Amino acid sequence: MQITDVLIKPILTEKTYGIMMSEPRKYTFLVNAKANKNYIKQAFKAIYGVTPIAVNTKIKKPARVRTGTQNPGYSRLEKIAIITVPFGVEVAITGEKPEPKEESSSKK
């Protein structure tokens, strides 16, 4: 498995945006099911240039889905990684550059 095949895509939902905006920042990715935490950490560092503090993983097991036939189908097995980066570090996972925070100096 190559280092570029580890991180498949970021997971962007309301829940993950809430986690992303807190300190320390945590980013959620769909990863290759065969990747371990060390591979995930190396891939994140190679792609984004930031060494993660921690990597937590969870496996979403296949669930039964309705197919409209007698035989049930199953969803795919997915592995999800929650990657924690150091304080003050911001990563642009959507392709946009992070905007610098502006302090409001206009007090009345």
Swiss-Prot record:
Short name of any one Pfam family annotated for the protein: Ribosomal_L23
Q: What is this protein called?
A: Large ribosomal subunit protein uL23
Single GO cellular component term: ribonucleoprotein complex
Query: What family, per the record?
Result: Belongs to the universal ribosomal protein uL23 family.
Assembly mode: Part of the 50S ribosomal subunit. Contacts protein L29, and trigger factor when it is bound to the ribosome.
**Where on the tree of life does the source sit, at the highest rank?**
Bacteria
Which UniProt keyword terms apply here? Ribonucleoprotein, Ribosomal protein, RNA-binding, rRNA-binding
Q: Which GO terms describe its molecular function?
A: rRNA binding; structural constituent of ribosome
Annotated InterPro entries: Nucleotide-bd_a/b_plait_sf, Ribosomal_uL23-like, Ribosomal_uL23/eL15/eS24_sf
GO terms (BP aspect)? translation
What this chain does, per the entry, is described as: One of the early assembly proteins it binds 23S rRNA. One of the proteins that surrounds the polypeptide exit tunnel on the outside of the ribosome. Forms the main docking site for trigger factor binding to the ribosome.
